[in-house]
Amino acid sequence: MKTKNFRDMTDEELLKEIDGFKTELFNLRFQLATGQLDNPARIREVRKGIARGKTILRERELKINRA
């Protein structure tokens, strides 16, 4: 998901999205451990999504405006 999409979300929506990413990451790691993971690159994408979401939330806390 693009950063612009995160910026368009409300804080509640952003928290739900981050929670969804965390659940997905848990499932992906479980699949990796059991050898059932089809796309290992997805783990990286999900981790970056979590980081982007948390960064946007923190910027809002500090009232930092980014383009």
UniProtKB/Swiss-Prot annotation:
Alphabetical keyword list: Ribonucleoprotein, Ribosomal protein
SUPFAM superfamilies (UniProt xref): Ribosomal protein L29 (L29p)
UniProt keyword Glycoprotein, yes or no: no
Coiled coil location: none
GO BP term, pick one: translation
GO terms for MF: structural constituent of ribosome
GO cellular component term of the entry, any: cytosolic large ribosomal subunit
InterPro entries membership: Ribosomal_protein_uL29, Ribosomal_uL29, Ribosomal_uL29_sf
Listed Gene3D superfamilies: 1.10.287.310
Any Pfam family: Ribosomal_L29
Family per similarity comment: Belongs to the universal ribosomal protein uL29 family.
Name this polypeptide is given: Large ribosomal subunit protein uL29
Organism name: Desulfitobacterium hafniense (strain DSM 10664 / DCB-2)
